[in-house]
Regions:
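Motif-centric detector for short Cys/His coordination patterns
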Residues: 1-125
């Protein structure tokens, strides 16, 4: 695990840029960070207690707050602010983005939910 050399919210507030000293750079969408928040309201209090997040397509990053020397608190415009993203967790999210994003899309599809806040998914037979 390494500490990023740069963490910036892009101007549109829908993405977090993370850079490391080895030259690696990652752009993590706000929606992705929100649905994979380490906060208890998302992760629950143990394995199998997760709450599937949906309707977060338009979520933005309102602000960042450093949590000691080991983590970042991300505040989202939907009011969510309880997730403390350790540098290690952010690196895991970045390195496994494709796999985690595909899994999330499959989970909301299987649950009949939408990434859009006001959408209602109707299954046709």
């Amino acid at each position: 695990m390494s500490t990023p050399t740069k963490v910036v919210v892009v101007e549109s507030k829908d993405c977090l840029l993370i850079a490391y000293s080895d030259g690696q750079e990652y752009n993590l969408p706000a929606e992705f960070l929100r649905v994979y928040s380490p906060g208890a309201e998302v992760r629950g209090h143990g394995e199998g207690n997760e709450t599937l997040q949906f309707g977060k397509r338009e979520v933005k990053i309102s602000s960042l707050k450093q949590a000691g020397n080991y983590a970042l608190q991300i505040v989202f415009n939907d009011g969510h602010d309880s997730g403390i993203y350790s540098w290690e967790y952010l690196q895991q999210l970045a390195e496994n983005y494709d796999e985690k994003w595909a899994r999330y899309l499959e989970e909301i599809h299987n649950a009949g939910l939408s990434r859009d806040q006001d959408a209602q998914v109707i299954k046709l037979m």
